[in-house]
């Protein structure tokens, strides 16, 4: 597992970020989308 920083924009227009562990960037993006109901779109996913 690798550590990823996922930066996203919420439905309110606020920028937010969360850390997660995943096998790849697509899995990290999916993890955030399933955990957070207020995500409008993902801005970027960065491997740390």
Q: Locations of the language-model features?
A:
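A short, exposed loop/beta-hairpin motif centered on an aromatic-Gly-Thr core
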Residues: 13-23
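Residue-level detector of intrinsically disordered/flexible regions characterized by low predicted structural confidence
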Residues: 4-5, 19, 48
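Short, mixed-charge low-complexity intrinsically disordered segments
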Residues: 34-48
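Short aromatic-glycine-(Arg/Gly/Cys) micro-motifs in beta-strand/loop hairpins
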Residues: 1-14
């Amino acid at each position: 597992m690798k550590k990823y920083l996922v930066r996203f924009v919420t439905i309110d227009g606020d920028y937010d970020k969360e850390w997660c562990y995943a096998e790849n960037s697509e899995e990290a993006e999916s993890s955030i989308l399933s955990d957070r109901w207020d995500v409008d779109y993902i801005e970027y996913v960065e491997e740390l």
